[in-house]
Amino acid sequence: MDVVLLVKAAIMGVVEGLTEFLPISSTGHLILAGALLGFDDAKAQVFDVAIQTGAILAVILVYWAKIRATLHALPSERQAQRLAFNLAIGFFPAVLLGLLFGKAIKAHLFTPVVVASTFIIGGLVILWAERRAPAATRIHTLDAMTAPDALKVGLVQCLAMVPGTSRSGATIIGGMLLGLSRQAATDFSFFLAIPTLIGAGVYSLYQERALLTVADLPMFLTGLVFSFLSAWLCVRWLLRYIASHSFVPFAYYRIGFGLMVLVTASTGWVPWVD
């Protein structure tokens, strides 16, 4: 058993868990962390997607009471049926775009310039959204969302296929701009993450199954466990944070991180691959 590899897997798991549900892009951070650790080959890229399962399990645990109540009410209550329908509608655009353009996006957009640009642009969008969104709020609970609202959030989620955008950032900020409260947008983003990230993980593992062996299992399990633990802590913290704070600090972080990516790429401090 390669202890160094397991340590790298644990670090990558922590990075995934801490960044998946904050509006700061887990993909961008995983690219940078992988480059710094020398953990960036084809198998590592599959690993990065697979350990999202740990983060998703954390969300399921945090929201388990709501999920269980919805599942129990699904056969008979319209509110539960509406939520399930809205999640299906929100999930569909990412599935379609991923199947059509996933390989092309991975081949051409995973570059430092793209990652840095989307970090900076995303930060500026958050600053703008936080100024505009509160005045436009019309939806305060998931029960008040309509199918068109869910579809629009699902379309915005597609932007997250560009590395550095942030899936949670796109859906939360997009939801706020569409009229959802910060809490409702965050809740829908986290619920929408469950089918989206599970689907992406299963599809990636299936597509790259030839790269994987039984010997890789300890590495994947280590990453998954650390992803789960760090995501559980992060989601619980974020839900408390948004009750009385805005996303403005994350905007400044994104801008600073984007500038750092440009510097490390141009100086060669981090071996980014163009």
Curated annotation (Swiss-Prot):
The chain crosses the membrane at residues 21-39, 44-64, 85-105, 109-129, 185-205, 214-234, 247-267. It catalyses: di-trans,octa-cis-undecaprenyl diphosphate + H2O = di-trans,octa-cis-undecaprenyl phosphate + phosphate + H(+). It comes from the Bacteria. GO terms for molecular function: undecaprenyl-diphosphatase activity. Pfam families: BacA (PF02673). It is a multi-pass membrane protein. GO terms for cellular component: plasma membrane. It is found in: Cell inner membrane. Its main location: membrane. Its EC number is 3.6.1.27. Keywords: Antibiotic resistance, Cell inner membrane, Cell membrane, Cell shape, Cell wall biogenesis/degradation, Hydrolase, Membrane, Peptidoglycan synthesis, Transmembrane, Transmembrane helix. It is an enzyme of class 3 (hydrolase). One of its GO terms (biological process) is cell wall organization. The keyword S-adenosyl-L-methionine does not apply. HAMAP family: Undec_diphosphatase. Belongs to the UppP family. Bacitracin is thought to be involved in the inhibition of peptidoglycan synthesis by sequestering undecaprenyl diphosphate, thereby reducing the pool of lipid carrier available. Catalyzes the dephosphorylation of undecaprenyl diphosphate (UPP). Confers resistance to bacitracin. This is Undecaprenyl-diphosphatase.
